[in-house]
A protein has these predicted regions:
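Conserved alpha-helical scaffold segments that buttress catalytic/binding sites
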Residues: 1-194
Length: 194
């Protein structure tokens, strides 16, 4: 992924630790970082998918903190595998992001290929909705891929407060069409002014 992304999980934990927690009926466990020391992202994605699947089967709710969307594929595969053991579920992905992350997988996976990988392998049971897309951050090729793969998206300017009801109605309609949701957030989908 991007330079500095590996420090993302620890930085997020540090900020979350400052917040008060009032849910006595819930417990939170931190399973540490999944290190990709040798640079083999595919092995790390497989390990993450196995862990995610195990947690879901145990009826835990895994929250994966990544530095980039290079973790999205493994996280999704674990969700998919756990849900398919119970029933044939349709999974909707809601991604708050400035980028589609639909780049073609050429040599090896990276943070920009995750949703293309997911839709290429699981597209018949998966729907993708990207909110906050910034046109200058995505090439014409990526918009063509989004169209080909029937990606739902809203541009960042449409996601502003004045369009709140429109955005909420689109999200509700998306949720209604799917049996399960995978929510993922990339901070570049939000203006630092907010």
């Amino acid at each position: 992924g991007r330079v500095g992304a590996a420090q993302g999980p620890d930085a997020i934990r540090k900020q979350l630790a400052r917040l008060a927690f009032h849910q006595d009926s819930l417990s939170i466990s931190d399973y540490g970082n999944l290190l990709c020391a040798d640079g083999n992202l595919e092995d790390c994605q497989k390990a993450l998918s196995v862990l995610t699947e195990q947690f879901l089967i145990q009826e835990s709710f895994p929250i994966v903190l990544g530095g980039g969307h290079d973790v999205a594929y493994g996280h999704f595969v674990g969700i998919h595998n756990a849900l398919q053991q119970k029933e044939n579920s349709r999974i909707g992905i809601i991604n708050f992001d400035a980028h589609f992350d639909l780049r073609p997988l050429e040599n090896q996976p990276h943070s920009g290929t995750s949703f293309n990988q997911i839709l290429s392998e699981y597209g018949s049971t998966t729907e993708y909705f990207a909110l906050g897309i910034q046109q200058p951050a995505n090439t014409q090729e990526l918009f063509a891929i989004a169209k080909e793969k029937k990606v739902n998206y809203l541009f960042n300017d449409v996601c502003e407060n004045i369009n709140y009801k429109l955005v909420i109605s689109k999200i509700h309609a998306f949720i209604e069409r799917n049996d399960a949701l995978y929510l993922t957030i990339d901070l570049d989908g939000f203006s630092s002014a907010y």
